[in-house]
């Protein structure tokens, strides 16, 4: 019997002397059947009588069953459970967790009424887990009770010997009883050789530091299973990753260093690395950037290549500007090209070739706005229209040239062209592109001329309706690229944070990891400090880890292997930036936050280059190093119009510059800002560089739907003495916002503004502040609660003028919702509105109304699409920023 379940059964024995009936007893069999089915009141009555009578006969004790009693069928026994037993069980959990500030009696009271239809101890656990998760509205530590139960269950059903777990994974059999090892022979042998050292280092108690959603995320997709049963603990996963990265050099010190900081939550590697480390197919890379040829043979080859990459959990970006337009002449067959209609097949492939059965396949397609099929492209994800002309599972992106933005601004003409007629436009950017574009225009080699502003409106219309296309500024990307000596960057990846050179023969790759920034905040005597030295150290560890992945990775294609070994790019990002600002009790766009933002990314960039320089001394530079900006002593911030007086002074950049000039670097690119959607759930922090979307929201797991509340906000409101159920209802009523709640001080409201309440100008400026230290780019979303052409245009132009490489990842608009979607019933809503004098809120956003105003907005408008004499100061980020 496992240790946790014995807690309950020991207490059962204390409450009553219930003895099992003989298995052949007709009454017993009937009662068990009824208990299992729990279909009628008779079940309770029969069980009650059986339990009482048997107890009386066996012990000669007049047993009075408490009023709050339920009946549990466990291993063929009839058991009596009371609220006191539940309380004792919860109390023991509190003792083991050393929790003293939570209310045992209140939790017991909330649990017991739910136990009317249970038949196993697991059901009791599930109700306690559910109750603990719901009680996050009382205190953010209640869900830790749920984690304790879940993790104890996992530990009871898995081995605390890492070798035993490894043996199970290595000796796995298929359904046909053939050998089907989950981990590789080399990994297994290494574990077997060093198991004593490993078992001394591994710390299973750290499993309990996960949040409930972190555990649920690992449980669903990451922890290894045999016959659908989990056999791996989180610490096994972290050790498996650490061993994979360093075992080939027999480097136990680096293995244990990586394990230590990974298991303590200082960083995490990307999802494919967590999925596949140590397995028979170690595909550890996150991003693949592809080019494509224009012939049918090359296109069909690309279909196969995409399927193979997606099969092994890689996200894909494909630049397809070179695909000739629909109706273009094909000399070999005297036929006509299908143009970008080929994307409907890519859409089907993405649906079929999912990522190892764990995540849907994901493809992003990039073209430039001069392509003749641009309007067809922009309609691909729309909800209306013929299904044969839609590809709603693809993600769409634009590589926008500066000349297009200039023509939109001037309300000038724009020429659409076919790449087969204008081949000199391909692989060009900046002045060279403009020169060729103007030449083709002057010669009349274009398909059609339109107002640039008409296309711009069409782009924004698609973004407002579907959230895409992404906006990448091609000239900014290439002007500031450390790979410019290799070639021109023509596309990006699935999430718009990777910008690497690729073509139909050379597919680029990137390996990612993210640093959990809140782990570097220490609060001493209520004064927060940020440990930049530790951040520097972690950046160096990750640089070496990611560099190792390049060498050990399983590559689905030679095109990916050759390019990655040649250019060796990596991507170190972050998560939990908003958590850091909350811990510092400073608003997201304050000067303190901006200073932290700059220093954090300067430190990561400095640490990454320092370690890459050390790696170059050990193994040599990457093959295409010579001729790169970094080989000439130019850092990323040297490629920007950057005021070096804004450097923190913490790091000796000139010394590092000289070391790099002397010895080079091992990696062509090192820093990025990826979304961290899944890994942020695991580590328990806010996503990436994003502000909080809401301070309270619901999240679905396999165990049900629970509320998540910003724990920093709860802590601050507890300190103010205003955290109570009424406050929770008000935050739910306002859909996660605290802006309109009267008894919250203004300084707290400023700290906990949601992304809908923070000016997008601030989001863009924060991105621009860190950009000189990000040599790839950033997954920067725009958040506009009720999108309009004017507001969206203003943001996009401001991002362009700030020199950002990514102008927009997704456009996020606020979904129409009501308070009852946040767990408040209609009567409660009416009560809140009446008590607080709130007028009924209306959420109205009609895309049709927006679209119908397009002709009115175009006339006489340039930047914000509002005539200058009607525009208020500060309305337009682009003009006034």
Swiss-Prot record:
Gene3D superfamilies: 3.20.70.20
Gene (UniProt): RNR1
Record comment: activity regulation: Under complex allosteric control mediated by deoxynucleoside triphosphates and ATP binding. The type of nucleotide bound at the specificity site determines substrate preference. It seems probable that ATP makes the enzyme reduce CDP and UDP, dGTP favors ADP reduction and dTTP favors GDP reduction.
Reaction equations catalysed: a 2'-deoxyribonucleoside 5'-diphosphate + [thioredoxin]-disulfide + H2O = a ribonucleoside 5'-diphosphate + [thioredoxin]-dithiol
Family: Belongs to the ribonucleoside diphosphate reductase large chain family.
Subunit: Heterotetramer composed of a homodimer of the large subunit (R1) and a homodimer of the small subunit (R2). Larger multisubunit protein complex are also active, composed of (R1)n(R2)n.
GO terms under biological process: deoxyribonucleotide biosynthetic process
Job description of the protein: Ribonucleoside-diphosphate reductase holoenzyme provides the precursors necessary for viral DNA synthesis. Allows virus growth in non-dividing cells. Catalyzes the biosynthesis of deoxyribonucleotides from the corresponding ribonucleotides.
Record keywords, A-Z: Allosteric enzyme, ATP-binding, Deoxyribonucleotide synthesis, Disulfide bond, Early protein, Nucleotide-binding, Oxidoreductase
Disulfide bridge map: 287-510
Organism: Acanthamoeba polyphaga mimivirus (APMV)
Binding site for substrate: 271, 286-287, 315, 493-497, 675-679
Active site: 493, 495, 497
Pfam families: Ribonuc_red_lgC, Ribonuc_red_lgN
UniProt xrefs under InterPro entries: ATP-cone_dom, NrdE_NrdA_C, RNR_lg_C, RNR_lsu_N, RNR_R1-su_N, Rrm1
Site for Important for hydrogen atom transfer, residues: 287, 510
Domain ATP-cone intervals: 69-160
Site entry (Important for electron transfer), positions: 809-810
Site (Allosteric effector binding): 294, 324
Keyword ATP-binding: yes
Site residues by UniProt (Interacts with thioredoxin/glutaredoxin): 876, 879
EC number(s) recorded for this UniProt protein: 1.17.4.1
PANTHER family, alphabetized: RIBONUCLEOSIDE-DIPHOSPHATE REDUCTASE LARGE CHAIN, RIBONUCLEOSIDE-DIPHOSPHATE REDUCTASE LARGE SUBUNIT
GO MF, one annotated term: ATP binding
Record flagged with keyword Oxidoreductase: yes
Name of the protein in its database record: Ribonucleoside-diphosphate reductase large subunit
């Amino acid at each position: 019997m496992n240790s946790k379940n014995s807690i309950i059964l020991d207490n059962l024995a204390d409450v009553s002397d219930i003895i099992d009936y003989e298995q052949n007893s007709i009454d017993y069999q009937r009662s068990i059947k009824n208990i299992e089915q729990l279909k009628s009141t008779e079940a309770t009555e029969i069980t009650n009588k059986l339990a009482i009578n048997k107890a009386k006969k066996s012990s000669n004790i007049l047993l009075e069953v408490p009023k709050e009693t339920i009946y549990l069928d466990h291993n063929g026994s009839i058991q009596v459970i009371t609220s006191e037993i539940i309380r004792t069980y919860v109390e023991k959990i509190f003792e083991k967790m050393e929790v003293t500030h939570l209310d045992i009696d209140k939790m017991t009271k909330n649990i017991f009424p739910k136990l009317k239809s249970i038949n196993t101890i697991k059901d009791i656990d599930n109700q306690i887990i559910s109750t603990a998760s719901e009680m996050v509205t009382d205190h953010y530590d209640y869900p830790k009770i749920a984690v304790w139960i879940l993790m104890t269950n996992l530990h009871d059903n898995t081995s605390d010997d890492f070798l035993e777990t490894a043996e199970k994974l290595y000796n796995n059999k298929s359904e046909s009883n053939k050998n089907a090892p989950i981990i590789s022979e080399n990994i297994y042998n290494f574990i077997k050789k060093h198991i004593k050292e490993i078992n001394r280092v591994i710390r299973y108690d750290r499993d309990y530091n996960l949040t409930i959603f972190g555990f649920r995320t690992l449980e669903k997709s990451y922890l290894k299973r045999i016959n659908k049963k989990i056999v791996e603990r989180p610490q096994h996963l972290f050790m498996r990753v650490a061993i994979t990265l360093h075992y080939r050099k027999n480097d136990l010190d680096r293995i244990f260093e990586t394990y230590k900081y990974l298991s303590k939550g200082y960083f995490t590697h990307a999802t494919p690395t967590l999925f596949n480390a140590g397995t028979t197919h170690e595909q550890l890379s996150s991003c693949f950037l592809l080019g494509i040829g224009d012939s049918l043979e090359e296109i069909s080859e690309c279909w196969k290549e995409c399927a193979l990459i997606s099969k092994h959990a890689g996200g894909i970006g494909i630049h397809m500007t070179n695909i000739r337009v629909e109706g273009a002449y094909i000399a070999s067959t005297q036929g006509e090209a299908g143009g970008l209609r080929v994307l409907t097949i890519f859409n089907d492939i993405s649906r079929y070739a999912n990522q190892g059965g764990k995540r849907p396949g994901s493809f992003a397609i990039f073209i430039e706005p001069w392509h003749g099929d641009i309007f067809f492209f922009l309609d691909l994800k729309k909800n209306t229209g013929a299904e044969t002309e839609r590809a709603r599972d693809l993600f769409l992106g634009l590589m926008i040239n500066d000349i297009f933005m200039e023509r939109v601004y001037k309300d000038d003409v724009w020429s659409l062209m076919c790449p087969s007629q204008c081949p000199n436009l391909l692989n060009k950017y900046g002045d060279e592109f403009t020169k060729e574009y103007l030449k083709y225009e002057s010669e009349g080699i274009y398909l059609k001329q339109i107002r640039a502003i008409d296309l711009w409106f069409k782009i924004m219309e698609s973004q407002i309706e579907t959230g895409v296309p992404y906006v990448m500024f091609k000239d900014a990307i290439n002007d500031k690229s450390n790979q410019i000596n290799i070639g021109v960057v023509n596309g990006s990846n699935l999430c718009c944070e990777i910008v690497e050179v690729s073509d139909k023969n050379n597919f680029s790759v990137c390996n990612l990891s993210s640093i959990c920034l809140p782990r570097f905040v220490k609060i001493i005597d209520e004064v927060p400090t940020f440990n930049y030295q530790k951040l520097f150290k972690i950046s160096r560890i990750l640089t070496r880890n990611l560099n190792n992945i390049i060498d050990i990775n399983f590559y689905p294609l030679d095109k990916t292997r050759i390019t990655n070994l040649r250019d060796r790019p990596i991507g170190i990002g972050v998560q939990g930036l908003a958590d850091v600002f909350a811990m510092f009790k400073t608003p997201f766009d304050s000067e303190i936050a901006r200073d932290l933002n700059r220093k954090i990314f300067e430190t990561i960039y400095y640490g990454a280059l320092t370690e890459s320089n050390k790696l170059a001394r050990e193994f040599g530079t990457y093959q295409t190093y010579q001729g790169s900006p970094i080989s000439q002593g130019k850092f990323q911030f040297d490629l920007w119009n950057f005021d070096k007086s804004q450097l923190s002074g913490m790091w000796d950049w000139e010394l590092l510059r000289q070391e790099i000039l002397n010895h080079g670097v091992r990696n062509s690119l090192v820093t990025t800002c990826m979304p961290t959607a899944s890994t942020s759930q695991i580590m328990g922090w806010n996503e990436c560089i994003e502000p909080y979307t809401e301070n309270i929201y619901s999240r679905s797991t396999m165990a049900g739907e629970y509320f998540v509340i910003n724990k920093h906000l709860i802590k601050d409101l507890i300190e103010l003495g205003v955290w109570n159920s009424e406050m929770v209802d008000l935050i739910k009523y306002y859909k996660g916002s605290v802006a309109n709640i009267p008894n919250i001080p203004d300084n707290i409201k400023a700290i906990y503004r949601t992304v809908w309440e923070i000016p997008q100008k601030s989001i863009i400026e924060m991105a621009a502040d860190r950009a000189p230290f990000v040599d790839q780019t950033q997954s920067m979303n725009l958040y506009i609660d009720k999108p309009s052409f004017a507001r969206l245009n203003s943001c996009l132009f401001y991002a362009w003028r700030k020199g950002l490489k990514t102008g927009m990842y997704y456009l996020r608009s606020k979904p129409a919702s009501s308070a009852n979607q946040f767990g408040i019933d209609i009567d409660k809503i009416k009560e809140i509105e009446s008590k607080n004098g709130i007028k009924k809120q209306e959420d109205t956003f009609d895309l049709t109304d927006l679209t119908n105003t397009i002709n009115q907005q175009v006339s006489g408008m340039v930047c914000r699409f509002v005539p200058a004499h009607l525009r208020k100061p500060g309305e337009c980020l682009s003009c006034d920023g």
